[in-house]
Amino acid sequence: MSIYAHSQQTVSIGPGFFTGKDYLDMTDNERRAYATGAINGMLVAPFFGAPADNVNWLKACTLKMSDEDVAAIISKYIGSQESQLNYNLNVVTFNALRNACPKTK
């Protein structure tokens, strides 16, 4: 799957392990665990060469969120857009958070 990054550069994203439907089939504890892991994974992107500035919006947005808050954002995003059921959950999660978080530079 390809998405547009902040700089409008097209990047290719691997499929990950789950789809939006898989997420909705998870228990609440599994959703919270997934949400925690997804945030942790995104926050270490600079270890893999991503500019630290690219995750500042995520740090600011999720600073005071609980795992339940993040899981609810993902659930609401998938639930409000049926097309998300068949998409790769890693990309759906990013888009859900980007949609829920204020845009910052």
Give names to the regions the model predicted:
Residues 5-7:
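Boundary at the C-terminal end of the N-terminal hydrophobic targeting segment
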Residues 9-20, 28-29, 44-105:
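Compact alpha-helical subdomains of small soluble proteins
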Residues 41:
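Cell-wall glycan-active module
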